[in-house]
Each structure stands twice: as C-alpha cells, then as structure tokens.
C-alpha cells in the first residue's frame, strides 16, 4: 500500500525563511530548466536536480570522463506553498522503493517479481508533490541498492551504509509550480575546472565504495533481515 507524507519546504531552514539557495552542476554554460524535461530513469524520475552544496555541484558538473570543464548555476527556490516529499524523513526502504520505480538494480526475473512487491509494500505515492528531496543514487549508492536486492545486506546496516557515501542530498523539481518558483542568479555562474573536481568526484566514490564494502563484509552485517525476507 502506498503511503503519503507532506513536508513544508520552510522546515528545512534553521531560521524562518521561505527561500533556499540551490546549485546545479552541468557541462553547459547556458542552461534553462524546462518543465516536463528530464530522464525518467533518474532517481526520482523526470525533473530538474539540484543540491544545497556548491562543492558537490562542482563535482557533478565534471563527473563525466570527457575532460571538459563545467559550470555551476546558482538558483533561489521560493518554497512558499510548495509540497515537498523528503525521503530523509522516511524509512530508507521507502527511498529504495522509489529507486526501484525508475532504475533497475538487477535484470533477473527474480528481481522483477520481488521489486514489484517491494514497491507495493514500501513505496509512497509521489504524484502531487512539487519537490522531492533525498539521497543521490550515484554509482556508490546504487552499489548499495544492487547488493541489497541480492540479499547481501541486512536492513540493520542500511542507514549506516548510506552515511558512508558522503555523496550528497539532492532536490528534484517536479511540478510546473516549482519550476515557476525557481529563479537563476545568473550573475553568480561559477566555472569548474575538470582536472581538480573530477579527481575529487572519483576519490569520493572510491573511498565510499571501500568503506561500504568493509561494512558489508563485517560482523555487523548479519544478513538476516534481507530484501527477500521483507516482503
């Protein structure tokens, strides 16, 4: 059964603000976010993805192995009256269920059958939300998802595994209303050097994978409450 939860965007702030600053890393100097665009195979489906961290945005701008410099575009999001789905406030299983809607963690018949049941049990209905916020499932985070559906990870260590990545929280702008509330601060466009920040991106990924493998192979991973037992 799908569940439903609403998180006012302003709750993200330590002070009572209605606007937040977000960054988008891209190879493109000229870029216009467009409602209805994007890839359905991304973590939360079609949408425009941003982060609160300018350093992570710089890494994401040059994460491709093409040796081209990138750009970070700075935006201000007016959160007034926006409905936000925050996966950090929900079970990690709910986040994994959302990934399974859009990305395949395995290509076996067993996975396809179990994934449908998992999504039905732990998924949430995302229609009607203006913004989705949660972990970014890049290579190392998706490594967790793949190992989990292979029954190699106990649920008791899932949240700790996610904390090891340090690879960032993202915002996905979903609705036309949210797009209209997003405004670029064009005078604050930042160039990104490929050699410096691609190396940082790769180093972060290598370190995350090592730490994750170490935890998965440790005694803390009892491999008792695993994917197939949670249905």
How would you describe each model-predicted region?
Residues 34, 39, 48, 175-177:
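Solvent-exposed, flexible loop/coil residues
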Residues 9, 17-41:
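Short aromatic-glycine-(Arg/Gly/Cys) micro-motifs in beta-strand/loop hairpins
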Residues 26-27, 48, 54, 77-81:
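Short, flexible loop/turn elements at secondary-structure junctions
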Residues 2, 6, 11-18, 42, ...:
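Conserved NAD+-utilizing ADP-ribose enzyme module
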